[in-house]
């Protein structure tokens, strides 16, 4: 059967999903999308995502692909899917992709955003599903910036992974290109993390560590020691899922001309810290130059 590869861009509120990946007996984003496709195509169809977000994690721009029969080339896939999907997951766009395009393996870097509620008192009920409100909410932002600088670069992030997940071929070394923060609203601060790949719960573990620094429970020097020890048991607790959102996935066509590693920090962002600040365009390139390694098939963000 002749097929056309379709590239999807999706957004979802992860609150009521048990993550992206299909699991028997529970609701996942993948299972919802595949069920909708089965109704349109008339047979099971696999959907491959750029990253397997965990239970409760949101996405503003999750990229995925599937192969559609060419006999259905007339179908407007975004409208057709949105007509079948629940309101907490939307297909933002759907377009034909190159036959060899792979949403996961072709990804060069990703940005995750984590939102903290900084005000005392109750969280705005319209925002409670998308922010973490640590108590007390007052945080030392300068100390958090200093600690974040320690984490930038190519490191073994074993201290910041979920120990219950088997390791893939890539091990625990990743390149964290940048961490920066921006106000997300009158009462919010958003931390963004860009890397060539993330270990399972890595961003939430990094955020939990930075908040511990902001509370004065851990120092920036302690963060360096935690990183060097490669021991998850000495690191602060994991930040909850509700504050985390997959914000962007970069592909080769998104890279600056001649650059095949990590994409640049967005121009409109004011980084708190970024890798090798004085290195110009090199600040977001892979160590040693060249292409980013393909993601491990077992990797889970």
Spans of model-derived segments:
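Structured-RNA-binding interfaces characteristic of tRNA pseudouridine synthases
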Residues: 1-286, 296-301
């Amino acid at each position: 059967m002749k097929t056309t590869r379709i590239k999807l861009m999706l957004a979802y509120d992860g609150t009521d999903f048990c993550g992206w990946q299909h699991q028997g007996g529970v609701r996942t984003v993948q299972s919802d999308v595949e069920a909708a496709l089965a109704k349109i195509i008339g047979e099971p169809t696999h959907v491959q995502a750029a990253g397997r977000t965990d239970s409760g994690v949101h996405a503003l721009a999750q990229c995925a692909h599937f192969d559609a029969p060419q006999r259905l080339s007339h179908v407007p896939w975004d409208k057709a899917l949105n007509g079948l999907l629940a309101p907490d997951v939307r297909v933002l766009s759907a377009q034909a992709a190159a036959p060899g395009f792979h949403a996961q393996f072709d990804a060069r870097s990703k940005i995750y955003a984590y939102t903290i509620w900084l005000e005392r008192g109750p969280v705005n009920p319209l925002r409670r599903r998308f922010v973490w409100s640590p108590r007390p909410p007052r945080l030392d932002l300068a100390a958090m910036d200093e600690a974040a600088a320690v984490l930038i670069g190519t490191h073994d992030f074993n201290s910041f992974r979920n120990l219950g997940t088997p390791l893939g071929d890539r091990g625990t070394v990743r390149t964290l290109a940048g961490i920066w923060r921006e106000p997300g609203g009158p009462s919010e601060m958003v931390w963004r993390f860009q890397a060539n790949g993330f270990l399972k719960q890595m961003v939430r573990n990094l955020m939990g560590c930075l908040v511990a620094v902001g509370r004065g429970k851990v120092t920036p020097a302690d963060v360096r020691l935690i990183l060097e020890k490669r021991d998850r048991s000495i690191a602060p607790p994991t930040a909850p899922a509700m504050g985390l959102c997959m914000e962007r996935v970069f592909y080769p066509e998104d890279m600056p001309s001649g650059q095949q590693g990590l994409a640049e920090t967005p121009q409109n962002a004011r980084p708190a810290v970024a890798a090798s600040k004085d290195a110009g365009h090199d600040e977001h390139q892979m160590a040693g130059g060249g292409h980013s390694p393909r993601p491990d098939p077992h990797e889970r963000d």
